[in-house]
Design a protein with these regions (language model features):
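Amphipathic alpha-helical hairpins
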Residues: 1-7, 24, 37-42, 49-51
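Short, well-ordered alpha-helical segments
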Residues: 2-33
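ATP/adenylate-binding site constellation spanning eukaryotic-like Ser/Thr protein kinases
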Residues: 35-38, 56
């Protein structure tokens, strides 16, 4: 059986890095992560440059 949690993460490098950060942080409190589904992506802009890449994602993991 799998459980799904919704997470928000950000990075100053890329959306890929934000997704990796989301999985790394989630793995500190849940085990058996199987997948991440990116629901939404957003970028914060200042002075015409992207300064933050943000994601809203679902992470699926096995229940013990």
């Amino acid at each position: 059986m799998l459980k799904v949690i919704e997470v928000l993460a950000e990075s100053d490098k890329s959306w890929e890095d934000a997704a990796s950060h989301a999985v790394t942080q989630a793995a500190k409190s849940v085990h058996g992560i199987k997948s991440i589904y990116i629901k939404d992506m957003e970028a914060k802009v200042e002075n015409n440059k992207i300064i933050k890449y943000r994601i809203n994602a679902n992470i699926s993991f096995l229940l013990d």
